[in-house]
A protein has these predicted regions:
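Conserved Rossmann-fold NAD(P)-dependent oxidoreductase catalytic core, especially the SDR/UDP-sugar
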Residues: 99-137
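NAD(P)-cofactor binding segment of oxidoreductase domains
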Residues: 72, 85-112
């Protein structure tokens, strides 16, 4: 049975992803992790939860080992509005989360899913019916 860790589970996508994956893999096989105490408390009503700062690779790895994780869903991201105001912080969080997820997925032979952030296309990219070969020029 797959054991899935969703990091950033308290975000917009994570809050929908947790119950969806629970339906397919069972309640006890989906672990929801988030940095924010309020989201961890809220999610603990409906899921197995862990508080996690994904930039702390040792804490991240401890959870992967504790639950014998087969798949990691990295939903952690600092979104465009904040990222454009503080690009260094966006880089630290978004790339740090990705790098730690890649490192642990490789070391523990887990599957990894990590989506592209919302601002990946940039301001000058067509917003409707965006062609597959569009040049991406993000602002962040």
């Amino acid at each position: 049975m797959k054991r899935i860790l969703i990091v950033g589970a308290g975000g917009q996508i994570g809050t929908e992803l947790v119950p969806h994956l629970q339906k397919h893999y069972g309640h006890d096989n989906v672990i929801a992790a988030d940095l924010r105490d309020d989201m961890v408390a809220k999610m603990s009503q409906v899921a197995i939860t862990e508080k996690l700062d994904i930039l702390d690779i040792n804490a991240f790895e401890a959870i992967v080992k504790k639950y014998d994780i087969d798949a990691i869903f990295n939903m952690v991201a600092l979104l465009s509005a904040t990222g454009e105001k503080n690009p260094e912080l966006a880089w630290k969080i978004n790339m740090g989360a990705l790098m730690n997820s890649l490192t642990l997925a490789k070391e523990h032979k887990t599957a990894l899913f990590t989506p592209s952030p919302i601002g990946a296309f940039g301001a000058n990219t067509p917003h409707d019916n965006t062609p597959q070969d569009t040049v991406m020029r993000p602002n962040t």
